[in-house]
């Protein structure tokens, strides 16, 4: 029998529902249960694939090519279980299906309404694909009271009535703000949040209270009294210095055991050795390396969430703190770069779309190459690395990417050469995008092959352009090694400059497969090179 857990939020957004869901999933795994985590987003976009990072943050890509919310990255990193397209849905996707079915006559002429037709699609999503799991945790995006979220709350209310309490648990996450003048945590916002949730027919079984400091027993008892929840089911969620401390904090507060007790499941011991090892490594991380991220969205860290975490995973591996130096690529010039990248141990240019800030990124790549600073280029970062090499090392001064320039020598070209730019719209952009996991063959005795310790790998992709293979020979004559190719050898996946300390560009997104207990091999080697560079300088 599958048990369903719904995680909702109130008071404010960005409270950490995703981390709570991911942490609980991991804790249940540690007790031997099989867990699936899903995200339901109330926005009207079909998926976040074409959303501005300022609106949404990172687009997380799954193995099967779904473009999803960054919370799925948390789910994967904490549980080690790969997410898929069946783990994410939006209001836009729901209405798209609904309207398509209506046009096909699948509703047999009845009036199509939010209840029951929209809610039925939501329920079908939640209740489907349950084979082989013991728990399904569903995170509802947004906060209680949001207009766009009402169909989702109604759907899970109906599921709660349908499955009864023995198979359905509601966890509500709220904020206890600390008011300095009063010197106390305020409970009133939590009261109102629970009241709003009850007004739509849902009574939370567990209340998780986020706070920046210790919550006293008196405060917990007061919350219990005013929100009509047993005090043992009021769980404190105190701010942590590192997100990888969150699961153990929840374990210490008994969240996992409270869930099992609610479902009348025997409480079993937890196997948390690898997480305690992570905590110990974090405590032992006294040295640090400085990594510059040459970013287009330098003020929006969530746009590069998986990159940040992958760097931190490598730091955990070596017991090093990663000091990230966010560098605005738009403001980088040949004259300013020495000052802005002073005392840097490694330079990373992440993926992205659009022409803005490309000049600064190319300047940073040149700086890394000519000063022998460890460099890692990801997706667009690799493409710009080939353009920089073409312009400044090989001498192809008019080297360009076809993504932005029609005139010039096209070092980077479309994957689908038959697709005209005029035909590329939001409706068909996915048809021209190489999305999801693809196999890649590595060349023996290269940096990549030595890092992976294998000649066959699978990595996730999200790109429409690739290196123009016509230039492979001239690049090789100048010392560039092409160390990874797609299975059909049409797409260059990895480039290296072996004569430098560490200079690697990859067409894929390795950050999506990194875990805190299993750092990605390329990030491990990049940070290793940065540590060695730091020691030499």
From Swiss-Prot:
Binding positions (L-glutamine): 352, 380-383, 403, 464
Entry binding sites for Mg(2+): 71, 139
SUPFAM superfamilies: Class I glutamine amidotransferase-like (SSF52317), P-loop containing nucleoside triphosphate hydrolases (SSF52540)
Keywords: ATP-binding, Glutamine amidotransferase, Ligase, Magnesium, Metal-binding, Nucleotide-binding, Pyrimidine biosynthesis
A Pfam entry, by short name: GATase
Record bears the keyword Nucleotide-binding: yes
Glutamine amidotransferase type-1 domain mapped to chain residues: 290-536
Pathway terms, separated by semicolons: Pyrimidine metabolism; CTP biosynthesis via de novo pathway; CTP from UDP: step 2/2
Disulfide bridge map: none
CDD domains attached to this UniProt entry: CTPS_N (cd03113), GATase1_CTP_Synthase (cd01746)
Regulation: Allosterically activated by GTP, when glutamine is the substrate; GTP has no effect on the reaction when ammonia is the substrate. The allosteric effector GTP functions by stabilizing the protein conformation that binds the tetrahedral intermediate(s) formed during glutamine hydrolysis. Inhibited by the product CTP, via allosteric rather than competitive inhibition.
Molecular function GO terms recorded: ATP binding; CTP synthase activity; glutaminase activity; identical protein binding; metal ion binding
Catalytic activity: UTP + L-glutamine + ATP + H2O = CTP + L-glutamate + ADP + phosphate + 2 H(+); L-glutamine + H2O = L-glutamate + NH4(+); UTP + NH4(+) + ATP = CTP + ADP + phosphate + 2 H(+)
Role this protein plays: Catalyzes the ATP-dependent amination of UTP to CTP with either L-glutamine or ammonia as the source of nitrogen. Regulates intracellular CTP levels through interactions with the four ribonucleotide triphosphates.
Name of the protein this chain belongs to: CTP synthase
Organism of origin: Rickettsia rickettsii (strain Sheila Smith)
Species lineage: Bacteria, Pseudomonadati, Pseudomonadota, Alphaproteobacteria, Rickettsiales
Gene: pyrG
């Amino acid at each position: 029998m599958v048990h369903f857990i719904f995680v909702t939020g109130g008071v404010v957004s960005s409270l950490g529902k995703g981390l709570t869901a991911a942490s609980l999933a991991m804790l249940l795994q540690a007790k031997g249960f099989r867990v699936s985590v899903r995200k339901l987003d109330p926005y009207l976009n079909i998926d976040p694939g074409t959303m501005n990072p300022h609106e949404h943050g990172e687009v997380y890509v799954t193995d099967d090519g779904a473009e999803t919310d960054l919370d799925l990255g948390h789910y994967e990193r904490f549980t080690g279980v790969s997410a898929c397209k069946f783990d994410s849905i939006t209001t836009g996707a729901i209405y798209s299906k609904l309207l398509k079915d209506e046009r096909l006559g699948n509703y047999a002429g009845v009036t199509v309404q939010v209840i029951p037709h929209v809610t039925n699609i939501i329920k079908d999503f939640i209740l489907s694909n349950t084979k082989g799991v013991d728990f399904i945790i569903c995170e509802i995006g947004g906060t209680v009271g949001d207009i766009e979220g009402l169909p989702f709350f109604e759907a899970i209310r109906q599921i709660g009535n349908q499955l009864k309490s023995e198979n359905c648990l509601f966890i509500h996450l709220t904020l206890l703000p600390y008011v300095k003048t009063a010197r106390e945590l305020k409970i009133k916002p939590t009261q109102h949040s629970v009241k709003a949730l009850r007004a739509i027919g849902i009574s939370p079984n567990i209340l998780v209270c986020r706070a920046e400091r210790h919550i006293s027993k008196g405060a917990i008892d007061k919350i219990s009294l005013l929100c009509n929840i047993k005090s043992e089911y009021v769980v404190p969620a105190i701010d942590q210095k590192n997100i990888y401390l969150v699961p153990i904090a929840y374990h210490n507060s008994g969240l996992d055991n409270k869930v099992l007790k609610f479902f009348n499941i025997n409480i079993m011991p937890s196997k948390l050795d690898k997480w305690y090892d992570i905590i110990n490594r974090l405590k032992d991380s006294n040295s640090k390396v400085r990594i510059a991220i040459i970013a287009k969205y330098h003020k929006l860290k969530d746009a590069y969430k998986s990159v940040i975490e992958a760097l931190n995973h490598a730091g955990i591996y070596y017991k090093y703190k990663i000091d990230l130096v966010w560098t605005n690529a738009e403001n980088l010039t040949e004259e300013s770069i020495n000052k802005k990248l002073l005392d840097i141990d490694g330079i990373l240019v992440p993926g992205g779309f659009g022409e803005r800030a490309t000049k600064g990124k190319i300047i940073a790549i040149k700086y890394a190459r000519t000063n022998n600073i460890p460099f890692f280029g990801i997706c667009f970062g690799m493409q710009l690395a080939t353009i920089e090499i073409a312009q400044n090392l090989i001498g192809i001064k008019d080297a360009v990417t076809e993504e932005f320039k029609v005139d010039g020598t096209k070092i980077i070209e479309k994957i689908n050469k038959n697709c005209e730019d005029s035909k590329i719209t939001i409706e068909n952009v996915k048809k021209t995008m190489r999305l999801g996991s693809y196999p890649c063959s590595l060349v023996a005795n290269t940096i990549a092959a030595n890092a992976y310790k294998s000649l066959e790998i699978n990595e996730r992709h999200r790109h429409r352009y690739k290196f123009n293979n016509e230039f492979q020979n001239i690049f090789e004559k100048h010392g560039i090694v092409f160390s990874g190719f797609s299975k059909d050898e049409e797409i260059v996946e990895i480039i290296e400059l072996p004569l430098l300390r560490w200079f690697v560009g990859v067409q894929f997104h390795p950050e999506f497969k990194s875990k805190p207990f299993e750092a990605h091999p390329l990030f491990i080697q990049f940070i290793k090179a940065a540590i060695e560079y730091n020691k030499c300088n």
